[in-house]
């Protein structure tokens, strides 16, 4: 399971010209689900992402996690993260989970985020979405379990 996380000052996801989810300062999490992923990996990745200290403390050091910073979370499914780009000029999608499995694990991940009490917004799994963000820093990390 892969999370491309970005520290943002704001982010929103739009579907069919309607805002599906929006946050102010916090984390935009682009989530990719691979074939071998399961609930245990979703739990581990969620815990790691939410504990990852990429927000500045009073001294300007990256020392706070999203909860400590008072931030929010926007989770967007992105199957293109689970690709094979080692050969050729077109991505291969054989590493990605089947849609039903990916949806179940995406829902599991977002439910776990919500259960922590951090305000969590989402896109819609499988939808054609437009994501707008202001990356703060820029600060972007690739986390994988």
Swiss-Prot record:
Its EC number is 3.1.1.96. It catalyses: glycyl-tRNA(Ala) + H2O = tRNA(Ala) + glycine + H(+); a D-aminoacyl-tRNA + H2O = a tRNA + a D-alpha-amino acid + H(+). One of its GO terms (cellular component) is cytoplasm. A motif (Gly-cisPro motif, important for rejection of L-amino acids) lies at residues 137-138. One of its GO terms (molecular function) is D-tyrosyl-tRNA(Tyr) deacylase activity. Keywords: Cytoplasm, Hydrolase, RNA-binding, tRNA-binding. GO terms for biological process: D-amino acid catabolic process. Pfam families: Tyr_Deacylase. It is found in: Cytoplasm. It is an enzyme of class 3 (hydrolase). It comes from the Bacteria. Belongs to the DTD family. An aminoacyl-tRNA editing enzyme that deacylates mischarged D-aminoacyl-tRNAs. Also deacylates mischarged glycyl-tRNA(Ala), protecting cells against glycine mischarging by AlaRS. Acts via tRNA-based rather than protein-based catalysis; rejects L-amino acids rather than detecting D-amino acids in the active site. By recycling D-aminoacyl-tRNA to D-amino acids and free tRNA molecules, this enzyme counteracts the toxicity associated with the formation of D-aminoacyl-tRNA entities in vivo and helps enforce protein L-homochirality. A Gly-cisPro motif from one monomer fits into the active site of the other monomer to allow specific chiral rejection of L-amino acids. Homodimer. This is D-aminoacyl-tRNA deacylase. It comes from Sodalis glossinidius (strain morsitans). The lineage of its organism: Bacteria, Pseudomonadati, Pseudomonadota, Gammaproteobacteria, Enterobacterales. The gene is dtd.
């Amino acid at each position: 399971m892969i999370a491309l996380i970005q520290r943002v000052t704001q982010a929103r996801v739009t579907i069919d010209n309607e805002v599906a989810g929006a946050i102010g300062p916090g984390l935009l999490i682009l989530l990719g689900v691979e074939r071998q992923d399961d609930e245990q990996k979703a739990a581990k990745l969620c815990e790691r992402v939410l504990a990852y200290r990429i927000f500045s403390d009073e001294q300007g050091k990256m020392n706070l996690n999203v909860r400590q910073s008072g931030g929010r979370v926007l989770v967007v499914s992105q199957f293109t993260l689970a690709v094979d780009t080692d050969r050729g000029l077109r991505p291969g999608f054989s590493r990605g989970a089947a849609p039903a499995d990916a949806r179940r694990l995406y829902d599991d991940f977002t439910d776990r985020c919500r259960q922590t009490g951090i305000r969590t917004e989402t896109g819609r799994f499988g939808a054609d979405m437009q994501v707008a963000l202001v990356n703060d820093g820029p600060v972007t990390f690739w986390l994988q379990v």
